[in-house]
Amino acid sequence: MPSLIPPIVSASSASNSAALDHLYHHQPPPRLPLGAVPQSPIQSQAPPPPHLHPPSHHFQLHPGHGHHQQPHHERDHRLPPPVASYSAHSHHLQHDPLPQRLESSQPGHPGAAEHRDHPQHALDEPSRSHDPYPSMATGALVHSESQQPASASLLLPISNVEEATGRRYHLDVVQQPRRARMCGFGDKDRRPITPPPCVRLIIIDVATGKEIDCNDIDHSMFVLNVDLWNEDGTREVNLVRSSTSSSPSVSSTVTYPYGSISVGESSHTYGQSAHPPSREAPYSVSQTASYAPEYQTQPTYSQGSSAYPSNGTYGPPQQYFPQHQAYRTETGPPGAMQTTVGGFRGYAQDQNALTKMAVVGGQPQGMFTRNLIGSLAASAFRLADTSEHLGIWFVLQDLSVRTEGPFRLRFSFVNVGPLAGQNGAKVNTGRAPILASCFSEVFNVYSAKKFPGVCESTPLSKTFAAQGIKIPIRKDANLKGGDGEDDYGD
């Protein structure tokens, strides 16, 4: 058998081959075939010896360079481990954090320094990249859950103690409002909320903790006030910009709380002009008014509260923007962009504020009016419920809402009778504190086309009507065609 003659390798080629072999240990291996199993993560995380760290510029070489010169024994070392080895360590890949994997590496394992598999790192990174997203989603869920108790706490009833008498007052909305038809801005066809809200007043003796008999209580000075709030119970919506049409659309009406409109000279107050200002003296008005740039013949001012064209024509109701506390001069000199009118000092608004206040001629401007109309205060009555149990009740049978949407009613109870220190007085001439308050459930106000019909008269309403309370009782549904009819009887 002929002896094998070793190949003759020059010094330059030997040095190049050694350099390529040295670099190859630090190049990414070829991609694994489809059926191959990735390498063990514990072996892939083993730190290399210090003498094998290459310079940073070596990683910028082409990975395919010198691939065909790889020795056979190195290829054997880079074969994937058995399936059992991978399955044994797959549990650590899913649950163990990165520092634990580094500590659990086996430095004595043969070829541990050579098993640095960069594709395995690429497989490991997506699994770690998904870790922040569950934490972020969990944080958002915790934040939303923390917001729910905050909003729910606003809807909790308030029960206070009257120190002079030692009584605690509590309101219980026994009959909740369900739906109503929007009445618009005309008073001829006003439909009340059905069924009428019925609130029972419960008085507890603080000393004994028991309910006081209503026959022992003088309820002649008890008053229940009601106002309108949004469905979340975070903002009152008692004001709305009125219109001359009897059935305004939702887009032309905006509700506002009482606190957003006030009278004064501060920069946070808003005024309304009952009549359009004259052309000759557009700056003499003490209250704020604005002119449309399409009709202007001289420098004008604009605010989100109203929009009056200077030629005497008017537009439909526009939205009121309390956050815009500024005036704008379109045709005046640049020095006139900052001015003072009627005690207000402001700066020019952006163009978006004027686009929101587009003026269309044909209808006069409206004024702010109440959104909840009717009898907003009710006196107390001693009535018997359906189980013949006497109690102090407040019945609000005359409430209507001008605009459609979901709302809540807030009930506030006060005692306007004389205080303990007012001897001989019949009426409280000072302030009356709110002794109890609560919210109703959410009810919906529909437009005339979407209104499903008034609710049937409840047994409680019929019981109170039989005792002299003026509650509109629905006529027999069989005579008038069902729930869709709006006929009432007394």
Swiss-Prot record:
Q: What happens when the gene is disrupted?
A: Leads to a significantly hampered growth when cellulose is used as the sole carbon source. Decreases strongly sporulation and down-regulates of cellulase-coding genes.
Where in the cell does this protein reside? Nucleus; Cytoplasm
Q: Where is the composition biased (Basic residues)?
A: 54-70
InterPro entries assigned: Velvet, Velvet_dom, Velvet_dom_sf
| Alphabetical keyword list | Cytoplasm, Nucleus, Sporulation, Transcription, Transcription regulation
Q: Where is the composition biased (Polar residues)?
A: 295-313
Q: How does it assemble?
A: Component of the heterotrimeric velvet complex composed of LAE1, VEL1 and VEL2; VEL1 acting as a bridging protein between LAE1 and VEL2. Forms a heterodimeric complex with VOS1; the formation of the VEL2-VOS1 complex is light-dependent.
Q: What is this protein called?
A: Velvet complex subunit 2
Q: Which organism is it from?
A: Hypocrea jecorina (strain QM6a)
Q: Which gene encodes it?
A: VEL2
